[in-house]
Curated annotation (Swiss-Prot):
It comes from Hadronyche infensa. This is U5-hexatoxin-Hi1a. Residues 1-21 form the signal peptide. Contains 2 disulfide bonds. Probable ion channel inhibitor.
Length: 148
């Protein structure tokens, strides 16, 4: 009888001690430090990887690349006040990422740069003309019955 009382008391004490220890050690985790060459939210998309050289590799896109890089760096480093008021590091990073994507979609490359980007992606040079056949529909002919 005494053994079972002691065993139950010991289980209760250990459970309470373990539960209290879990609650007091739940401080906010520090933000993860990204590995060099990796974003905190996973690997970079294929078009952002260094071996693709971005837009600088495409003829006529140097100015576009510089302007975009300047704007992206400013957003990446600073974000905006609306992002800084968010409570967690993850929310702040997601907010900055969304602003970065919005800014990227607002940057419109010059026409020549856009043509060269298409040429670079497809392998078709701007001087090559690709003609698509226009669909032709045959008009159905109906025979009129001849009357005798």
């Amino acid at each position: 009888m005494n053994f079972s009382v002691v065993a139950v008391a010991l289980v209760v004490v250990l459970t309470v001690h373990f539960t209290d220890g879990q609650e007091t050690s739940s401080s906010l985790p520090s933000p993860p430090s990204p590995l060099p060459g990796r974003w905190p939210w996973g690997p970079k998309p294929w078009h952002c990887r260094p071996h693709h050289h971005g837009f600088t590799m495409i003829y006529g896109c140097e100015k576009f690349s510089r302007d975009m890089k300047k704007e992206m760096d400013a957003l990446r480093n600073n974000g905006s006040e609306s992002c800084r008021t968010l409570s967690t590091w993850v929310e702040q990073e997601n907010c900055k990422f969304e602003q970065l994507m919005d800014a990227r979609s607002r940057v419109v490359p010059e026409e020549k740069c856009l043509q060269n980007m298409v040429a670079f992606a497809t392998g078709i040079t701007p001087s090559t003309t690709v003609t698509t056949p226009t669909p032709t529909t045959e008009t159905p002919t109906t025979e009129t019955p001849s009357t005798p």
